[in-house]
Amino acid sequence: FHFAGHAHAFGALSEADALRHRQVNFEATRALAEAAGEAGVARFVSLSSVKAMGEPQDACIDEDWPVPPESAYGQAKRAAEDALLAAGERYGMHVVSLRLAMVYGAGGRGNLERMASLVRRGVFPPLPETGNRRSMAHVADVVAAMRLVAADARAAGRSYIVAHPQTHSGRGLYDALRAAFGLAQVRWSVPRGVLTALARLGDGIEALAGRRVPLDSEALDRLLGS
């Protein structure tokens, strides 16, 4: 099972960042797959990302989605999948790539965990319902998928999306987190226009300070528009 990788970074990437994605997420995976094949490893399961495909916008997609990835991260992940498939064919190795949606679970340090921390403290704004949808996968389901594709010969040479069938809007996540923490339901929301203005203010602060702030235009788009 190959877990190692350079974490997805949002926003504009420098040339050094893009090179890092290629070196770690693609070239290192390719080298590891070749070494595994040379050593006679029978099965190799690699954790990829749904970002290895182009953005679906409002479409419900499967593994055959033809749109190529746009980001340096996604391109490196897709190249790693192709390299793994080539190694599998060359060495007769059982290879599978799992394209993970946003993963959550105990000990996580991603966007959902940061959102949960702010909701629990009562400082996360009640989002408006925009009808956006996000796919997610619990870490236990990811582990189950890894074990399944490693053991089933039918999975060899394939890439699979790993995501729960139920999707969530930003507001739906907010309400679910409040319920999980035993907090009262909030029946109002901050208007999208107000959040947009605050996000643009965050953009300006980032430009001056040279570091990310909790709310900028990109973060808002992920909450309301993805």
Q: What is each model feature region?
A:
Residues 1-24:
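NAD(P)H-binding glycine-rich loop region in Rossmannoid oxidoreductase-like domains
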Residues 2, 30-72:
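Conserved Rossmann-fold NAD(P)-dependent oxidoreductase catalytic core, especially the SDR/UDP-sugar
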Residues 20-31, 71, 75-76, 137:
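Glycine-rich NAD(P)-binding loop of the Rossmann-fold in SDR/ketoreductase-type enzymes
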Residues 28-31, 43, 65, 79-80, ...:
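Conserved cofactor-binding/catalytic machinery of classical short-chain dehydrogenase/reductase
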Residues 53-54, 93-114:
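Flexible, glycine-rich beta-alpha linker
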Residues 55, 68-96:
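Active-site Tyr-X1-5-Lys
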Residues 108-114, 128-151, 157-161:
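Substrate-positioning beta->alpha
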Residues 148-215:
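Mid/C-terminal beta-alpha module of Rossmann-like enzyme folds, strongest
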